[in-house]
């Protein structure tokens, strides 16, 4: 069984590059705004990127702006996006999806329909975000798919069965938009 799990993990990690954008490294002087929800706000991944650049390329200074806000959904990101551009970023990353699909609705009857409606709304709201992006053609945009949700965890004694499926639908949508 352990060999099977290891094989599946290796296979999936090998396929990850198939769906990834080809992203150029940050350049000296880049001003990167990481936009998203609480995963961006408190996830620290942007500080690891900054630290990597500072320790590996000390002569290539980059500036990082944490523009993550806990609880945000795509609509809320759209509503505050002009403020993000006040920092005059040269690169903007965007991640959303976890909050967009909701939480407690997955424990209710009709959860699939509710989730489908939430995914559709998130995609419509992303179209509004793209309209703002068009005002800044010189800014490089990077889409980051939401992290997966562990439906099997009992850490908080509350699981939301089916939550990962609509998150993956949003990730697939973003992958399609990135091409």
Predicted regions and their residues:
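Catalytic nucleophile serine of serine hydrolases
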Residues: 38, 68-70, 147
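Alpha-helical cap/lid subdomain in secreted, periplasmic
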Residues: 26, 47-63, 72-179
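N-terminal secretory targeting modules
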Residues: 1-35, 39-62, 82, 86-88
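Short glycine/serine/threonine-biased micro-segments
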Residues: 31-34, 66-69, 95
